[in-house]
Amino acid sequence: MKHIQIRNSDMAWHIAANIQFPPNFDESKQYPAIISVHPFGSCKEQTSGNIYGKALAEKGYLVLAYDASFQGESGGEPRWIEDPTQRVEDISRVIDYAVTLPYVDAERIGVLGVCGGGGYAINAALTEKRIKAVVSITGVNIGRLFLEGFSNYDPIGVLNAMASQRTKEARGGELQINELLPASLDAAKAHGLTERDVYEATDYYKTPRGQQPGGATKMLFSHAQKTLAWDAFAFTEVLLTQPVMVVVGEKVGAFGAYRDGLEVYGRAMVSQDRQLVSLPDFSHYELYDKPEAVQEALEKVIPFFNTHLG
């Protein structure tokens, strides 16, 4: 694995990434590449890199797992911004870098995203036609999630609060950084936060199971307005022409990945090859790293990429 900083000539800050190489890597050859996109609140050292990225590299792909702008080891100020348009642009920036590498076949580039990263991967493929195949692992439409649960079903109230907070910050006030999860499983239980997705997210992000320094699960509240008006799947019926695989778990939770997966699969009517992989025994967060869940997903994902990028 090689750690890099991507900063193309038209970028104001760098994107931190890890390149994972296939076995017996030979710089004189060309390889298909996968851009691996992390979830909302995550980082490249978690599921996008150390689970799916690692597995795909072992199967012959060159994988670039990276930190989103404003997050992890990537640049951008202020920190902890979740900006969907920037998240999608980050994918193109990483592709810009990948196509300069002599050992990457620019005609065989795919994207895989997990959770919010799955929604971003699909959205990027709508207009970024250098992407030849896209896989969403328990993908979430982050705009829909913010509009509903993350705003407590009061989006106008939250937007007004964001407006007030941003004005305070513009006048020199302290930034409001929201923690998105309970501090521990005990804290989740103490506050009655035992809904499947919330509790399993806490188990992943707040325990040694998945915890990493870059996976902050934080958000700058005042800069999240655009997220509430963003739709990962807009124009899918017209623009998503590339092969797409949507992997979902049928153990449903409040974050809505199962619902979003069925929606985008149904709307991907012009895709050259749309596939839905619905796994009955697994939940959203089990698909992050649980060996049985990941194995079942990869049994479909790897042949899919082999078909379209091989």
Protein language model features and the residues they cover:
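Short beta-strand/loop motif that positions the catalytic acidic residue
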Residues: L239, V246-V248
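Alpha/beta-hydrolase active-site loop
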Residues: I81-P102
